[in-house]
Amino acid sequence: MTTTLRPTEPLQQPADGGRSRTYDICVNSRRVGSVRVATDPDFGAASGRIERLRVDEPDRGRGRGTVAALAAEEVLRGWGCSEVQISVPADAVPALGLARALGYTERSRNMLKELADGTPAPPSGIGVRSMTEEEYAAWETRARDSFARSWIDRGVPEEQARAKAAASHRDLLPEGLATPGTAIHVVVHDGRVVGHVWTGVRELEPGVSAGYVYDIEVAAEQRGRGYGRALMLLAERVTREAGETLLGLHVFAGNTPAIRLYESLGYRTTHVNSSKPLL
């Protein structure tokens, strides 16, 4: 039996230069599932994505998903992509195993927490306040560069990484500190800012919104003193005040201290994000 991809729509090419297309997964012309491939609007045309790969229940366990994934990679190669990205639900154990078998490496993960009523206040003796406009001007440049560097350190070409960082800040902070739904707070020690947390609200899926921690950092020499936990508790309080009951975040693979902190606060992994070079 032969497993192939059959287009279900014309190639989509929006004005931003991206591409996308949905395919049926077919075995001897019989439909057994579907998959969508696309270029990434933030990383640029050289980075592709495999999305919504699904094999119908009766045809699972027969290698259909493996062949479909490899065929989707070939489509992206034909579009000139040099890497492919995937995001797999954390509870989809077979799909995670398939990703590892096909050579994908975890790059980051998404985590989520259901917030209880009465979020505790930050520990006594730790001062937090809103970021000032003067602080924002210097912070924005540093934060954008740090975000890009995190991608570069995980194998993303510098041009793509900086494009991703610029697009994220442009889309999420169009009016800086005045951007609706945005809050950036700092933690202060002995009159000096030693950390920050940037929170907002985003749509996790159609009809489901949540608070979101876009960025959190504590100065290296001040880590291990409870400032990160204090900032995360502040993020919970800000999110509850905004009327949201969920708080999500994104954390890069290898950031073990941060992952342990989030897990200790009750966050669970919802998606594992992985990548693979297309040679």
Which residue stretches match the model-derived regions?
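A short beta-loop-alpha structural element at the N-terminal edge
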Residues: 5-15, 127-154
